[in-house]
Amino acid sequence: MKPALVTLCSFAALATADWTGNINYGSPSLSHNLGLSMKKVLKRHGHSDWSGSHVHSKDASYSSGEAPTAGFMEASMLNFTHGVASGDPYPDSVILWTRASPNVDNNESNATVQGTVPLYNHELLEYVYTSTSPVCVSYAVSTDRNMSSVVSSGRAYTSSDIDYTVKVEAKGLKPWTQYYYQFSICGSDNKSPLGRTKTTPWRHQDVDEVSVAVYSCSNFPYGFFNAYGNVARKDNVDYVIHLGDYIYEYETSSQSRPVEPQREIFTLYDYRRRIATYRTDQDLALSHQQFAWITTWDDHEIANNGYRDGFSGLNNTEDSFEEDGMGVSVDQRKMNAVRAYFEWMPIRQVDMDNNLRIWRSFQFGSLFDLVMLDTRNYDRSITTLGWNDHYITELLNHAGRTLMGSLQENWFYNQLVKSFRRGATWRLIGSQIVFSRVNITTWFGSEEDPYNADAWDGYMANKNRTLKTMYDHGIDNNIMLAGDSHLNWVSDLVWLDHSNYSSQTGSGAVGVEFAGAAVS
């Protein structure tokens, strides 16, 4: 009896891996309230028990080495609707993404719900029809494009709970190595497009050159995404960095390049559908297929001029929920947007105990460290909202104002110090918004409000704390990367009045800033 018991336990463990191997069931983290109840998901899809670490299947074929059949969607019903993507590369692993979906679209498929149910209730059955047939997807990673030298492979399930998205971590890879990958519907010839990705160098590896493409601000109705496609076709970079505003939430009436939904987006379905529309752009799809992406969000992934407690068009009052938000609160809207973002983007679970964390760092050998910040949504003090701009100008130097919150700020400063001490030559900082002081009086400012208080200029104490960290520890070779303004800015990083800076030679500066124009 003992061998049989071991076999059954092995089946159970494999079945668990097939479900939990799809990171999106727990995204953005395994233990906070945006994750799904796996007990309910498993029960609905044919599993009789969930004990936390083991699944006991009604059908042993679910967990055998062969392709599962009973209760699963037929391969002929499914399509890889939005290509493939990879992201958040490490020296030994990378995130792989795809979507394997039937041709259905349900604008009621909101996992976050309305009414008097608890805020974090994710039970779907009470509100919408959901599929009881999961999709089984396998993946393989190879050193050659013919997929003949597979070095990592696995299987994962997906379902309507997570918009049929699949996100897995391919492990056991070698540093600074190019790989090819492909998904397929289990037990069939229904395959995804072939993707390509690349791991990062080992932290102490000597690397002479790493090429990155840096993007921000891509608004689908306002132009084609040629910038993505040109770099992909030239094929002369290693990775892609996106600094935010990957989508825009606005209502649009564009007929030449319509986006779905056409109204301003608020619900989980809205955000899923909007990202899905963007991913139909062939240049964007090609870039995702060719390169590993590292992304963060700015404001428009959720809503314009976002901060900790609201947005320019929606605040934390019941009247605003009803008048401006289609009955959707600030917290609800943020949950919807964050969940859709983690479902659709090739991004890792960053922190298992942090509801909104996207800030993280990457090491590219001894050449540079990349620090990706969230200067927008995590714990930002109030920003300019249109009606309060002059008031915010009066607060520019207030010591308590922060773009990041104390937790992220302290982490950021520690990252700078650790990077310098480990001997990394450069530090790249993805900060979304422009860091350097810019007088915008002749642009769209005024004599009374001469600075863009929605950028770092509106949070002078936070800027000064950043510069103080750099100067106190002698941390130079810092490169700030920014988007948001839709304009190109290049400047030295200088703590004015605290350093002997020469604008002719650049001496006294601790780095430079490159703020790029928009994709569209």
Role assignments for model-derived ranges:
Residues M1-T20:
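Fungal secretory targeting signals
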Residues D18-S520:
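Metal-dependent phosphoester/phosphodiester hydrolase catalytic core
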